[in-house]
């Protein structure tokens, strides 16, 4: 689940007196934003682990109740590459899935049963000689990355290579955190790109800072001359103190936020994305149906305080960025089953 301490509501931020310039409006589709063969659609989605099913209550429904909405949103957004977090890798929750041996294979298969054409960059659950479990594990690097996984649309992109790196910086006694990466080629154009996915530690700001440094170091080491798209749950809102350092550091490294958000500013003064959809809603919802608790519902020119990010090579054109949620804009309540305690975030880039 997401890091509660970084969740900022519009009320709390208003109390700080923080203001900014206007966001770009969300115009109707035009020649400038209409889909082209060069468009590639990316996303990041923290699924909320199936391991939490035993605690599911109220609007936090079990995985099998949430999965149809997850599938519908992913397919509806026509994503080419998606980074997912909390897609549990263990077989011990077999009773909570029915289309795979664990949560990420269950999701992959559910997407394809519904008409998708998705594959995982790596299906190995663990870095063991026998990678299906950790029982009597003999270490072997299988490229596994715990519950952090990359899905890609085989109809639109081809995977060229993939791997993962376990961060040196970890919080003792907690789940290991990984940097997961892959290189792809767009079938329609032949363009290649580097994609990474991560879920930074939720327990320690010091650990997150160390892991973020490793995101940059690993990206710089691995991407070569390819454009970069880096997504994930960074457990960091733009109001976290260290965001003042790391948001500019990502941009200086060559791959800034696709919205061009700045530390502690509620509105983007120099927009990068040409179109923003539901940008006033936070990416973390805590399984709450009323979006007024985690958005700027009364000031929709502002950007929500998300902890899920999409970074991309600074020179790439960003056609659109969106928070995906089934919110009724009249009642400000999410309709139907909430798919996760996070909202899917996605961006359309031109390669």
Cite the ranges covered by each PLM segment.
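Active-site beta-strand/loop signature of hydrolases that rely on acidic residues for catalysis
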Residues: 42-47, 70-100, 151, 182, ...
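Solvent-exposed loop/turn segments at secondary-structure junctions
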Residues: 47-51, 87-91, 125-129, 156-157, ...
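Loop/turn elements at helix/coil->beta-strand transitions in domains of secreted/extracellular proteins
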Residues: 37-41, 77-82, 113-120, 156-158, ...
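Metal-dependent phosphoester-hydrolase catalytic domains
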Residues: 220-227, 236-351
């Amino acid at each position: 689940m997401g890091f509660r301490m970084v969740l900022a509501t519009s009320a709390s931020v208003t109390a700080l007196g923080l203001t900014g310039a206007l966001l770009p409006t969300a115009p109707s589709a035009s020649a400038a934003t209409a889909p082209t063969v060069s468009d590639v659609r990316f996303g990041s989605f923290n699924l909320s682990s199936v391991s939490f099913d035993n605690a599911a209550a109220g609007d936090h429904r079990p995985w099998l109740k949430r999965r149809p909405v997850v599938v519908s949103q992913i397919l509806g957004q026509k994503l080419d590459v998606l980074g997912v977090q909390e897609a549990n890798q263990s077989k011990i929750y077999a009773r909570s899935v029915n289309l795979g041996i664990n949560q990420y294979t269950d999701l992959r298969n559910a997407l394809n049963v519904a008409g998708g054409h998705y594959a995982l960059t790596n299906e190995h659950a663990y870095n063991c000689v026998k990678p299906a479990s950790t029982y009597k594990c003999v270490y072997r690097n299988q490229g596994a990355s715990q519950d952090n996984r990359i899905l890609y649309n085989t109809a639109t992109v081809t995977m060229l290579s993939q791997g993962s790196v376990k961060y040196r910086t970890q919080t003792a006694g907690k789940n290991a955190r990984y940097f997961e990466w892959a290189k792809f080629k767009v079938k329609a154009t032949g363009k290649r790109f580097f994609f990474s996915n991560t879920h930074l530690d939720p327990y320690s700001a010091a650990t997150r800072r160390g892991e973020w440094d490793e995101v940059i170091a690993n990206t710089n080491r691995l991407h070569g001359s390819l454009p970069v798209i880096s997504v994930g749950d960074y457990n960091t809102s733009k109001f976290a103190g260290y965001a003042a350092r790391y948001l500019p550091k990502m941009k200086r490294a060559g791959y800034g936020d696709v919205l061009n958000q700045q530390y502690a500013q509620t509105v983007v003064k120099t927009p990068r994305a040409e179109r923003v959809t539901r940008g006033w809603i936070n990416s973390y919802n805590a399984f709450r149906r009323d979006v007024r608790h985690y958005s700027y519902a009364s000031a929709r020119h502002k950007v929500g305080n998300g902890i899920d990010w999409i970074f991309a090579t600074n020179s790439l054109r960003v056609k659109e960025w969106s928070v995906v949620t089934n919110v009724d804009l009249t009642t400000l309540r999410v309709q139907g089953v909430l798919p996760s305690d996070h909202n899917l975030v996605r961006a359309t880039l031109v390669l």
